[in-house]
């Protein structure tokens, strides 16, 4: 169970934010301090597995062919991009950008990685969506399932950044535990732990925000 202060903050946000006619995202607004973000070592770039996921199915794109591609589709991949389609995307940047925006993340067989970097790096890189390599000893189905509960903490060179922690339809307890996992990870990876956290607020898409750190 999450610590009481985090749970109370989540409950307050959910109770005091007007209900919308769509499923709102619940996010964290993270503000860092006392860090020179021009130095790559101070930038946050961490994958976190949320104990309760995001309350929605992530759209995962997989660059693969043959049996791996078939198994990726069976495991729930939103898109399976073959080597032929990859070549087509290289010459159609509009289509490549559309695909990049529609997918939450990408996975690729290792033999695809050099071509992806060369032809799609300019599209995927700035979005933080360069593919996760599928290593030869890794099962594509298991990897897809594990990534359904994964998020990326990515500050780039900014002191302030946002990250989703779930949907408003989730229980306060589940959301609070997701928040606690993220705060704990930040405390672990930041140079001075919590002393590098100026504030952390939990908020809904269009509603109230409440401080948790």
UniProtKB/Swiss-Prot annotation:
Record-level GO cellular component terms: large ribosomal subunit
Ribosomal protein found in the keyword field: yes
A Pfam family recorded for this sequence: Ribosomal_L1
BP terms from Gene Ontology: regulation of translation; translation
Alphabetized GO MF terms: rRNA binding; structural constituent of ribosome; tRNA binding
CDD domains: Ribosomal_L1 (cd00403)
Classification via InterPro entries: Ribosomal_uL1, Ribosomal_uL1-like, Ribosomal_uL1/biogenesis, Ribosomal_uL1_3-a/b-sand, Ribosomal_uL1_arc, Ribosomal_uL1_CS
Keyword tags: Repressor, Ribonucleoprotein, Ribosomal protein, RNA-binding, rRNA-binding, Translation regulation, tRNA-binding
Function: Binds directly to 23S rRNA. Probably involved in E site tRNA release.
Family listed: Belongs to the universal ribosomal protein uL1 family.
Subunit structure: Part of the 50S ribosomal subunit.
Record-given protein name: Large ribosomal subunit protein uL1
Organism of provenance: Methanosarcina barkeri (strain Fusaro / DSM 804)
Lineage, top ranks: Archaea, Methanobacteriati, Methanobacteriota, Stenosarchaea group, Methanomicrobia
């Amino acid at each position: 169970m999450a610590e009481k202060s985090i749970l109370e903050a989540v409950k307050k946000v959910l109770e005091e934010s007007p209900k919308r006619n769509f499923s709102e995202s619940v996010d964290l607004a993270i503000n860092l301090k006392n860090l020179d973000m021009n130095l790559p070592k101070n930038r946050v770039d961490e994958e976190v597995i949320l104990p309760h996921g995001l309350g929605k199915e992530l759209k995962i794109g997989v660059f693969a062919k043959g049996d791996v591609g078939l198994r990726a589709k069976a495991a729930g991949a939103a898109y399976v991009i073959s080597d032929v389609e990859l070549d087509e995307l290289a010459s159609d940047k509009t289509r490549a950008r559309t695909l990049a925006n529609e997918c939450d993340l990408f996975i690729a067989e290792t033999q695809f990685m050099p071509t992806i970097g060369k032809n799609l790096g300019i599209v995927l890189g700035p979005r933080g969506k360069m593919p996760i390599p599928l290593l030869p000893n890794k099962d594509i189905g298991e990897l897809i399932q594990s990534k359904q509960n994964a998020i990326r903490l990515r500050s780039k060179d900014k002191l302030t950044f946002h990250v989703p922690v779930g949907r408003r339809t989730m229980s306060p307890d589940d959301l609070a535990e997701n928040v606690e996992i993220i705060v704990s990870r930040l405390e672990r990876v930041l140079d001075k732990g919590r002393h590098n956290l100026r504030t952390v607020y939990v908020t809904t898409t269009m509603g109230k925000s409440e401080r948790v750190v």
